[in-house]
Regions:
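Adenosine-nucleotide cofactor-binding segment
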Residues: 99-102, 112-176
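Short helix-loop-beta connector
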Residues: 65-68, 90-96, 158-159
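A glycine-rich, Thr/Ser-enriched phosphate-binding loop motif common to dinucleotide/cofactor-binding enzymes
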Residues: 32-33, 40-49, 66-87, 100-108
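Glycine-rich phosphate/adenylate-binding loop and adjacent beta-alpha elements
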Residues: 1-59
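Glycine-centered, small-residue-biased loops immediately flanking beta-strands
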Residues: 95, 185-186
Length: 189
């Protein structure tokens, strides 16, 4: 569910991700019924349904010529990764960014960091093919996890990166993100 647009977090336009309705209402408020019995959606989203009913705030009209398999990528992975760089972390021009994970969300985060004007973008992944993709998408450096400390020393003089974006969802890379940023840096988990 999208943010409600009415609570204090939504109204100030700075923290719609903290919307209480979004966090709790989408999972607990039944939107459908069969007879008198409430019907809940899987995780509040109807993920495995062939059709679902959505509030207008959750819908974006697309050109009918855009294939749905392409449009669906933009609506999830691309917006999550690029949004982490542009909207959540607010990467600044000339900054240094380390991105853990070079899958779909990670390469979108790389693109977001590029758009924001980051000078140094380090992608971290275990998979060589994904590191190659990261370079193609704009990473200035692509390293394996064991090479992060060397990249940190080379790029930041050991002080740490301005931003770390964790795009895997693994507790180890979450911790590594905090360790990778400089004092006062931003880790986006």
């Amino acid at each position: 569910s999208p943010p409600c647009g009415e609570c204090k977090f939504c109204v100030d336009h700075t923290s719609p991700n903290l919307c209480v309705t979004l966090q709790f209402g989408s999972m607990t408020i039944p939107h459908f019924s069969e007879g008198n019995a409430p019907v809940h959606a899987m995780a509040g989203t109807g993920t495995f349904a062939e059709k679902t009913l959505l509030p207008k705030q959750a819908v974006v009209k697309i050109d009918p010529d855009i294939p749905l398999d392409i449009a669906s990528l933009i609506g999830c992975g691309v917006m999550t990764g690029a949004g982490a760089a542009l909207n959540t972390a607010k990467v600044t021009p000339g900054s240094s960014v380390i991105i853990y994970g070079a899958g779909g969300v990670g390469v979108a985060a790389i693109q977001g960091a590029r758009i924001a004007g980051a000078a140094e973008i380090v992608a971290v992944d275990l998979n060589d093919a994904k590191l190659d993709d990261a370079r193609r998408f704009g990473a200035t450096h692509a390293v394996k996890p064991e090479d992060v400390d060397g990249a940190k020393l080379e790029i930041t003089g050991g002080d740490g990166f301005d931003y770390a974006l964790e795009c895997i969802g693994n507790p180890l890379t979450m911790r590594a993100s905090f360790d990778a940023v400089r004092r006062g840096g931003t880790a986006c988990i």
